[in-house]
């Protein structure tokens, strides 16, 4: 989890901006969205193979 300590002369807006940047770098929001709904292993494999097929098609085009 991202953690930000607010300095003595630092505004709350700057600290909030740093916190949001750290969260985005750590991938917190994307992880939350990914885990929002359960996805069975078979569905994960299907999505992964479909993405690979799309990449391959795009590359050969």
From Swiss-Prot:
PANTHER family in UniProt: MITOCHONDRIAL 28S RIBOSOMAL PROTEIN S21, SMALL RIBOSOMAL SUBUNIT PROTEIN BS21
Concerning HAMAP family, the annotation shows: Ribosomal_bS21
- What gene name is listed for this protein? rpsU
Name of protein = Small ribosomal subunit protein bS21
Check the record and name the Gene3D superfamilies matching this protein. Answer: Ribosomal protein S8
Swiss-Prot/TrEMBL keywords: Ribonucleoprotein, Ribosomal protein
Q: Which GO terms describe its biological process?
A: translation
Q: Which InterPro entries match?
A: Ribosomal_bS21, Ribosomal_bS21_sf
